[in-house]
Amino acid sequence: MGDKIVWDLYFMAMSKQNKLLRFLKKLFIALLLFLIAYSGYVVIETRNVKDMTIRQKVLKAAYPVFTWLNKITGNKSKVFTNESPASSPQSIYDLTIALNSGDSIPLSNYEGKKLLIVNTASDCGYTDQYDDLQKLYEENKDKLVIIGFPANDFKEQEKGTDVDIEKFCRLNYGVTFPLAKKSSVIPGPEQNPIFQWLTDKNKNGWTSKKPSWNFSKYLINEEGVLVNYFDPSISPTGKEVMDAIKK
């Protein structure tokens, strides 16, 4: 009888393990951010951050821990791969990007290179991925173009103007890859035409996967075929992205 009770308790504990881990993760992050905000401000100030709000500085400092927590709590980051890439019903090279600077550029200019398209935000837990994106761009610019699409769709984490966004990215992360004009990236009447293509399988020929949060990533190959989707928690310099770029 005693053994049965022990086993029952064991299985109950196992069934609640994931829920407990999620709770502990949130609690740990909350405590961490509190401690950073009140005792780590001087340390954050020494990390070459300029024109950042307190929130942005805290998020920047917390990003490595946030990434580590995702790993140890078994976060299932999603990567979708197009196993049978074929020409899309509508060519992405027919589309034009309205840039942050006010200029426009046709995507046909990038034909023959891979394209990594990322929806971005300045006040997100993943904002420090700008650093990884810039590093990825610098190391692969002969074969890869990265384009950031600032958007305020997720918890209003990009409230700045195009001028604010450009300044923030340039001063704090040294961003030199193209930034699009701020727009909406989720399905709806205001959705950016590029993301209309990315999230409609009738246009791209593969998937209707919409961004799950800021810093969702879409990879398009040299022929203009959408071949990968990476969740926000996938680092731009992680193995998943690097392997896809090398193909």
What are these regions (language model features)?
Residues 13-92:
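N-terminal targeting signals for export/organelle localization
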Residues 113, 120-123, 150, 223:
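Short pre-active-site segment immediately N-terminal to redox-active cysteine/selenocysteine motifs
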Residues 126-192:
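Structural microenvironment flanking redox-active thiols in thiol-disulfide oxidoreductases
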Residues 193-196, 201-247:
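Thiol-/selenol-based redox modules, centered on thioredoxin-like
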